[in-house]
């Protein structure tokens, strides 16, 4: 797997940029983008270090992912799913919700720490505790 180059701006360019802007700049796909084109409201393609989802958001994310990529991952270590919302309820609709993430994890060989089973921990704590969230990383989320 070839990972994209993540280049943070030098001190001169970083001057006047927020920390968030520096992270987005570093993760942009189009390295030819000028500083003048990089501004609020611009549409950019970025490389994400991690694409986390909970059992609540995973079905929607997986559906969109499959539409865009045809179901092929660039790097399975970019995807992470935590089951912490719809577990232990005994409801069929909740089981259906979590089964989508389980099937995705199986197809793409996602295991711990990238796939958290019920009881492993709460989404927002689990991934950082597992060392998957690092300073300067670009990690989009639904909430």
Region spans (language model):
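Fe-S-dependent hydro-lyases/dehydratases of central metabolism
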Residues: 1-142
């Amino acid at each position: 797997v070839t990972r994209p180059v993540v280049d943070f701006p030098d001190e001169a360019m970083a001057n006047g940029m927020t920390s968030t802007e520096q992270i987005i700049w570093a993760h942009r796909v189009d390295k030819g983008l000028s500083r003048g084109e990089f501004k609020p409201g611009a549409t950019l393609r970025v490389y994400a270090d991690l694409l986390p989802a909970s059992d609540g958001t995973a079905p929607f994310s997986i559906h969109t992912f499959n539409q865009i990529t045809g179901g092929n991952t660039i790097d399975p270590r970019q995807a992470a799913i935590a089951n912490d919302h719809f577990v232990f309820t005994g409801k069929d609709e909740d089981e259906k919700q979590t089964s989508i993430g389980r099937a995705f994890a199986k197809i793409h060989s996602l295991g711990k720490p990238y796939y958290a089973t019920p009881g492993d921990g709460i989404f927002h704590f689990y991934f950082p505790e597992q060392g998957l969230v690092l300073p300067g990383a670009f990690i989009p989320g639904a909430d």
